[in-house]
Amino acid sequence: MELETVLYRVEGNVGIVSLNRTKALNAMSKQIFVDLTTAFDAAEKDDTVRCVVVNAEGRAFCAGGDIPEMKGLDNPEAVFDFYNVAGIFMKKMINFVKPTITVAHGAIAGAGTSLLLAGDIALVSDDAMFMVAFGAVGLIPDCAGHWLLPRACGLNMAKELMMTQRAVKAPEMKEL
């Protein structure tokens, strides 16, 4: 399957979905959400796939939303369309019928944090660092971040991370 921003392959009984916008640190564009949905649809329909692993190519898991693309959304319909496509994928991943495992390395920011937490199991490398960076760009957590983060680390810690945009390194991540 050829996708523009995501690699998808099946190894044994595992569907492997890899973010592949390395020049943009795998920032979440509208196209990446479309491609993720397509890859998950393929994994869902393939009876040989028993679980799905989401990882990323390059030096970062995901730098968050594609801010230049988001700034270019110049009318309400375009904004709605972008977030609708994102929401369709996030809902699909959160409610996916097969187990999902996210495997992250390097920078994990904003929507990347939401993607990490949307999996049934999240694994991070020792070099991983995440930040709930929405406030730094004047947004509230999207991509279900406002719902996923409190479930992962508790309400008070989630509020702290959302309000301060404090970077959290892998060892502390495991404590949360």
Q: What residue ranges belong to the model's regions?
A:
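Hydrophobic/aromatic residues within transmembrane alpha-helices
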Residues: 17, 54, 66, 115-117, ...
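Crotonase-fold acyl-CoA enzyme core
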Residues: 91-176
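Phosphate-coordinating loops and pocket residues in cytosolic domains that bind phosphorylated ligands
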Residues: 27-30, 63, 72, 136, ...
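Conserved CoA-thioester-binding segment of acyl-CoA-metabolizing enzymes
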Residues: 1-57, 91
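Glycine- (often His-adjacent) and acidic-residue-rich active-site loop
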Residues: 55-92, 108
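Histidine-centered beta-alpha loop that forms part of the nucleotide-sugar donor binding/catalytic region
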Residues: 20, 65, 105
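Hydrophobic alpha-helical membrane-association signature
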Residues: 32-35, 82-85, 115
